[in-house]
Amino acid sequence: MPVSSYRNILDLGCGRGRHSITLAQRGYQVTGIDLSKKAINKAKQVAKQKDLHNVQFLVRDMRDPLPKQFDGVVNLFTTFGYFLEDEENRNVLRNTKKMLAKEGVFFIDYLNPQYVEKNLVPSESGMYENLTYNVTRKIKDGMVFKTIQFSGDSLDKPVKYRERVKLYGLEWFRDVLGDSGFKIIETYGNYDGAPFLAES
């Protein structure tokens, strides 16, 4: 998306702002939203450290559309499918369409259920910034459940995070995006532009 044509970008579910900040560094005017106040505060801190004035971060539910339109909306790293009710996830896409300018582009990066079901790693552990982490994953009722636990000398007690994501396939997205008013331009299997396949 050239900056000259897609100046204003919304990062939907921005977390700690990793992608928002990269986009801002490339010259886009970026708004990042996330429900986590802690994540947004961290994103603001990093943006300030990098002296970026073309990015703002807001604590906001992705189901609640902003009262403005953007040239582009990005939803990256499977930041979708969090809600138990399918209708709520559909509403996220409908509201995303409302926030797009007439010639705007929506880019969504989402897992491939076929690949996940075949290659799910039930557990793993390692080190991250002097902390030990343990991750467990399971598939149940059409969702992936992930638990991440951090422990280490710098923590008073182990910190645990839980995530769940719906296993929506490509056909589901085609139907729901079409019903929401989107026209699908391309579907890729990776960031290099490879075709989407069952093993992507």
Residue ranges of predicted features:
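A short glycine-rich, Lys/Arg-flanked "PGG" loop and its adjoining helix->strand segment in the class I
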Residues: 90-102
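Conserved class I S-adenosyl-L-methionine
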Residues: 6-13
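Glycine-rich helix-loop-beta junction characteristic of Rossmann-like nucleotide cofactor-binding loops
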Residues: 1-4
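Class I SAM-dependent methyltransferase SAM/SAH-binding core
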Residues: 18-64
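A short SAM/SAH-binding and catalytic strip from SAM-dependent methyltransferases
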Residues: 71-87
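C-terminal lobe and adjacent flexible extensions of AdoMet/dcAdoMet transferase-like proteins
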Residues: 170-200
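SAM-dependent methyltransferase
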Residues: 102, 107-176
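A short acidic, Gly/Pro-enriched loop at the edge of an enzyme's catalytic core
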Residues: 63-72
